[in-house]
Amino acid sequence: PFVAGPPSDGQKRFLRALFEAANEQQKFLHDGVRSGDMVRAVKAVFARHGLSEYDVYPPMHGIGLAEAESPYPDTESDYFLRSGMCVNSDISLFGHPDGSNRIEEGFVITEKGPESLTPLIRELVVKGI
């Protein structure tokens, strides 16, 4: 996520919600987790912050040759994440008065949790604003 210049208080609140959702998602990026459960957890963070109307895309998609390829889960998805899957976390909000922003990270799903393919982004998300 980026802001040109110093962030306003509204932009800070907005970014904190994105960071919170990205960090919450980490709890679900494990072998055997139902993909819809992960989507609902991310959406719950946005709902707590009153940001649901700006959440327009699923929070994860596959890594490959096309944009937003499978897996592309929604709240009703019942397939499981499996070790060895490579996914992009795509935590994003669009059309908010304080701006639109996205945190996109790559991960390999493992039995112990997500292995980051983008460690600098992961470090910045954990650090927050």
Language-model segment annotations:
Residues 1-129:
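Active-site neighborhoods and metal-handling regions in enzymes and metal-associated proteins
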